[in-house]
């Protein structure tokens, strides 16, 4: 006798596959070395709770987006993290930025 798969079990298996395959990961920053350095500098600014450095990083990331070196989707995700840090939510911003960085795939 062949066991029957319930719809809920099948849906759970599909959802697990989608989640573990990275379909819901952060936007990718691309291969540009300058973008990598700018995001690394942003992590330092957020980690040290430095508003002035945070502003410089924000400006640099905008320049990279305008130059086509940072995809708009990645810039938007980072801008949201920066806004959160500006509101004083440094630890939450750092955690989100860390997740963004860990979610990057080498191209």
PLM region spans:
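Sec-dependent bacterial lipoprotein signal peptides
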Residues: 1-23
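Short terminal alpha-helical segments
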Residues: 24-48, 94-105
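Intrinsically disordered, glycine/charged-rich N-terminal periplasmic/extracytoplasmic linker segments
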Residues: 56-107
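Weak global preference for isoleucine
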Residues: 2, 19, 39, 81-82, ...
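Post-signal-peptide N-terminal segment of Sec-exported extracytoplasmic proteins
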Residues: 31, 38-72
């Amino acid at each position: 006798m062949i066991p029957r798969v319930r719809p809920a079990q099948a849906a759970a298996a599909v959802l697990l596959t989608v989640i573990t395959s990275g379909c819901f990961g952060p936007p990718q920053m691309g291969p540009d070395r300058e973008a990598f350095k700018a995001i690394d500098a942003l992590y330092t600014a957020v980690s040290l709770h430095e508003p002035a450095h945070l502003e410089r990083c924000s400006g640099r990331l905008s320049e990279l987006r305008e130059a086509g070196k940072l995809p708009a989707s990645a810039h938007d995700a980072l801008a949201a993290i920066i806004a959160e840090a500006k509101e004083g939510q440094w630890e939450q911003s750092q955690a989100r930025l860390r997740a963004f960085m860990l979610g990057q795939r080498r191209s």
